[in-house]
Structure formats: structure tokens, C-alpha cells
């Protein structure tokens, strides 16, 4: 289901809207002119909108593609916010330039501009 979500989202993270990669971090780092450690933050993961621990099913309607950074940050909290609330939080922080390091925010300024227009 992850790959289907990745395709339907045009390879962009459900939360931050940054481009992701599925299998080749090296190519991603070269294309986007970021370091390999930075590229690894954008590995595509399957994100369950309703967590399995909360009864969420492993089916396409419950899975979106999210970069590993956003996925880990969401689930690293004591209580994971709803996908809608978390997406709003991520977009708000992007608009303020506070989600990724300044270098990544500069590299992907087009994504930030899209977030500001929403």
C-alpha cells in the first residue's frame, strides 16, 4: 500500500509535502543536491492514519506515504496527534521555517511557498 500511496501523492510526503524516495537515497541526494544523511530523512514510509494499536487496518484507505522524518516525529510524541492536526502543525512550522534545518528549507523553497499559499 505504501507504493500506491507514494504514486497517488506524486512522491510527496502527506505531512510536509517534500519529495521522498523509495529505493535510492544516493540518486535522491544528487538530484536534490543534499547530503546523503539529509536524503535519508526523506525515505518513504507507510503511515497508518489510524494506528494498528488503535484498531486501524492495514488497507489502502488507511495508509498514506510519509517521509521517515514526519512519521517518526508524529509517533515520537506521548500521544500522536490526529493526521489532520499533525499535518496542520507541520505546515504551520514550515511556514515559519521551523520544521527542517535552514539548508533543507532553502533547498526546497518551492515546497515552502506551496505551504504558504494554502
Please identify what each model-predicted range represents.
Residues 1-33:
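Short, charged surface segments at domain edges that flank catalytic/cofactor-binding sites
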Residues 12, 45, 66:
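The −1 position to Zn-ligating cysteines in a subset of zinc-ribbon hairpins
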Residues 13, 85-88:
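Charge-dense, low-complexity polyampholytic segments
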Residues 16-19, 52, 69-73:
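Cys/His-rich metal-chelating microdomains
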Residues 20-63, 78-80:
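Histidine-centered nuclease catalytic patch
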Residues 63-86:
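Short Cys/His-centered divalent metal-binding micro-motifs
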Residues 72-76, 105-118:
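Short flanking/linker segments adjacent to small metal-binding domains or redox-active Cys/His motifs
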Residues 78, 89-105:
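Acidic, metal/cofactor-coordinating or nucleic-acid-engaging core segments within structured domains
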Amino acid at each position: 500500500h505504501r507504493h500506491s500511496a507514494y504514486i497517488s501523492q506524486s512522491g510527496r510526503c502527506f505531512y510536509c509535502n517534500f519529495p521522498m524516495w523509495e529505493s535510492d537515497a544516493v540518486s535522491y541526494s544528487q538530484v536534490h543536491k543534499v547530503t546523503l544523511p539529509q536524503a535519508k530523512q526523506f525515505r518513504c514510509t507507510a503511515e497508518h492514519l489510524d494506528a494498528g494499536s488503535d484498531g486501524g487496518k492495514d488497507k489502502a484507505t488507511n495508509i498514506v506515504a510519509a517521509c521517515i522524518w514526519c512519521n517518526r516525529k508524529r509517533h515520537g510524541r506521548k500521544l500522536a496527534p490526529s493526521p489532520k492536526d499533525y499535518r496542520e502543525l507541520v505546515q504551520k512550522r514550515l511556514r515559519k521555517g521551523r520544521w527542517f534545518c535552514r539548508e533543507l528549507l532553502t533547498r526546497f523553497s518551492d515546497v515552502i511557498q506551496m505551504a504558504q499559499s494554502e
